[in-house]
Design a protein with these regions (language model features):
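Glycine-rich, proline-tolerant flexible connector loops at the mouths of alpha/beta enzymes
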Residues: 62-69, 89-118, 123, 129-136, ...
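Catalytic beta/alpha-barrel core
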Residues: 94-96, 105, 126-137, 151-164, ...
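Short, well-ordered coil/turn segments that N-cap beta-strands
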Residues: 47-51, 89-91, 123-127, 150-154, ...
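Active-site mouth loops of central-metabolism enzymes
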Residues: 50-83, 104-107, 131-135, 157-159, ...
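Short loop/turn segments at strand-loop or loop-helix junctions that form parts
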Residues: 53-58, 93-100, 212, 249-252
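Acidic (Asp/Glu)-rich catalytic clusters
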Residues: 84-88, 114-122, 143-150, 167-175, ...
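Catalytic alpha/beta core domains of metabolic enzymes, predominantly
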Residues: 162-307
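N-terminal amphipathic alpha-helix/helix-capping segment at the start of soluble metabolic enzymes
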Residues: 1-71
Length: 308
């Protein structure tokens, strides 16, 4: 005798916050769902995941041959930004200011702000701006970025526990941007940063989390379990300090692992280098979205097209 299967949708009386990035008629909204990722059998998804294209203030230095080919003919940051915005499947442009790193090129804040303005003037799509990853420099740099982008409703990535007062207050209060809150793959650290940011006076619905990332195969299980726990607490326990949507910068992780960086001369049996980089980027982004990311940031046009 066959037993009938009656599916009962899992309904939560809670939602992930819907956060809109961008201004005018060029906006994207991330979050807003009341179900686990891709559980469309429980409820319709309010906003499908979004994809950003990463570009750097360093131009095309150090990028793969396939990426260079896509940007052929682009000589200025404005040119690069326009091509990124036009990429098939792109929802927004993410500018990373890696040249500001004091342990690297150490560009001045004025130089970096000039790049931010050039990119902002070149494209009208939603903008995400990432700092240089140095907490002291970002504490000075990102408030100036927030000031330069007034009126754009941009996402500023990211404040951390060490510099949230400077960045959170500037981006979230003084200049009315969206605050990216970055923690290191730990639900308690993610929640604590959201709590202290809202205590500054920043609206919880103007915060997007970057809970940390890794390339697939590189301690990646921690990323999955952390996202899983965050979504579980946000929806199952209606924890409003974990209901911020999640954005994950994927490309910075995946293009730096040996599978993507080893040359074909060194590793002929691994196949074409560009394809390996795309594979790492696609599989990591797909896993991030399945685990709970509401947006991912990618670099290669093939990756963007595939994930979209």
């Amino acid at each position: 005798r066959k037993m009938p299967f009656n599916q009962k949708p899992q309904k939560f009386n809670a939602k992930i916050n819907a956060v809109t990035i961008g201004s005018g008629d060029k906006t994207v909204t991330i979050g807003g769902d009341c179900t686990f990722p891709f559980y469309s059998f429980d409820a319709e998804s309010e906003n499908c995941p979004k994809i950003g294209v990463e570009i750097s203030d360093m131009g095309l230095e150090g990028v793969s041959e396939g990426i260079k080919a896509y940007y052929e003919g682009a000589t200025t940051m404005a040119d690069i930004a326009k091509k990124a915005a036009a990429m098939e499947g792109a929802d927004f442009v993410a500018l990373i200011l890696e040249g500001g790193d004091p342990n690297g090129v150490n560009k001045s804040i004025d130089e970096l702000i000039a790049v931010v303005k050039e990119v902002a003037d070149a494209v009208d799509c939603p903008l995400v701006v990432e700092g240089c990853k140095n907490v002291e420099k970002d504490a000075e740099l990102l408030p100036k970025v927030a000031e330069a982008l007034q009126g754009r409703n941009a996402l500023i990535l990211s404040e951390k526990e060490e510099n949230y007062k400077a960045i959170g207050a500037a981006a979230g209060l003084a200049y009315n941007q969206i605050v990216g809150a970055e923690s290191a793959v730990d639900i308690n650290l993610a929640k604590q940063l959201n709590v202290v940011t809202t205590q500054l006076g920043v609206d919880a619905k103007k915060i997007v989390m970057n809970i940390g990332s890794a390339a697939a195969g590189y301690g990646y299980e921690y990323v999955v379990s952390t996202m899983d726990r965050i979504k579980g607490a946000a929806l199952g326990q209606n924890d409003n300090m974990l209901q911020m949507p999640i954005i994950t910068p994927v490309s910075a992780e995946t293009w730096n692992v040996k599978e993507a960086t080893a040359s074909e001369k060194d590793m002929p049996e691994w196949g074409p280098q560009d394809e390996r980089g795309i594979d790492m980027e696609v599989e990591t982004a797909a896993a991030d979205l399945a685990a709970g990311s509401d947006a991912v940031i990618l670099r290669h046009p093939e990756s963007v097209k595939t994930i979209s």
